[in-house]
Each structure stands twice: as C-alpha cells, then as structure tokens.
C-alpha cells in the first residue's frame, strides 16, 4: 500500500526527485545539488519543502561519502556538488555496506511507484554501457591468444633465462 505523504522519509523523497530528473533528462549524466533541491520543492511530494532535503542530497544519501548518521546509498557524488542516482557496481564508503539503495515499494507515494521499475532498467542499461565504454575493461581477454600455447609458468621461466 502506498505511503501517505506525511510518512515519506526525506531520503525516499530525495531518491524520487533524483529519479524524476534522470527520467526527464536522460542525456544528463548527473545533476547539481541545487537542481535536486529545487525539484524537491517544486514536486512537493511530502508537502512544503522540508529543510532536511538539502543535507540528504549533500551527505546522508551519498554512497561515496563517509556516513554521518545515515548509511543510505541512494545518490553518487560524481564531482563537487554533482549527484546522480547510485547504481549497483558504483563504489561506496565501506561503512555504508548494506545501506538502502531505493525506497521500499510499499513506501512509495501514489503515482511514483513506476519509478522503481524504471530505475531497475536504467541502472542495468547504465552498467552495461559503463562496462562497454571503459577502455580497460574492454581489453579483458584480448591477450588470451598470446599465451594460448604457453603456460604462464613456462613464460616466466623463459623470460628469466640468462639472468645472472
């Protein structure tokens, strides 16, 4: 059952707003902290703008920052004052291990629950394209044929022949 607006956690509100921004502007890789805060005020999901939104966008929800009372992994800091939604495969502060990544379906307000399905697809596609775009990961397996006829131990022995 969708949650009442008054019961919506600030962290869940921040996640919803960030998801709305990503869905509306898929060409943008990330957003300024101020954009997220402004969109939260504009959406007014839980009523008038709440003062905790800013600190959640800056600190509490940011996976790759040391936790400060909250261990959420909902956002990822891409640069100074820049955020995007966290996705599996992103690095995060070790103390945030096991932290909440998305709102629970039963905690989503009416009209926003489809964002969870959108997020699963977006996150999956983003992971695939990140792997394909990474030049180091693209090299995986490229040298396999170089050593296909020689074991690693034999190769090292051959290299060391004649040392001393």
Predicted features along the sequence, with ranges:
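DNA-recognition alpha helix
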Residues: 17-21, 32-46
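Phospho-regulated, low-complexity intrinsically disordered regions of nuclear gene-regulatory
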Residues: 2-21, 47, 51-138
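Short linear interaction segments
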Residues: 131-164
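Flexible coil/turn residues that form the inter-helical turn or adjacent wing/linker of helix-turn-helix
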Residues: 29
């Amino acid at each position: 059952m969708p949650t009442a607006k008054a019961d919506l956690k600030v962290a869940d509100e921040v996640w919803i707003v960030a998801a709305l921004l990503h869905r509306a502007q898929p060409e943008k890789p990330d957003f300024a902290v101020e954009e997220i805060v402004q969109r939260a005020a504009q959406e007014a999901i839980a009523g008038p703008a709440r003062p905790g939104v800013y600190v959640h966008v800056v600190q509490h929800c940011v996976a790759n920052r040391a936790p400060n009372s909250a261990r959420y992994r909902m956002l990822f800091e891409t640069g100074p004052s820049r955020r995007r939604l966290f996705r599996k495969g992103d690095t995060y502060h070790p103390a945030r291990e096991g932290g909440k990544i998305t709102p629970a379906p039963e905690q989503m307000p009416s009209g926003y629950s489809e964002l969870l399905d959108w997020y699963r697809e977006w996150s999956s596609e983003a992971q695939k394209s990140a792997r394909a775009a990474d030049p180091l990961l693209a090299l995986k397996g490229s040298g396999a044929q170089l050593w296909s006829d020689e074991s690693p131990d034999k190769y090292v022995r051959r290299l060391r022949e004649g040392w001393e």
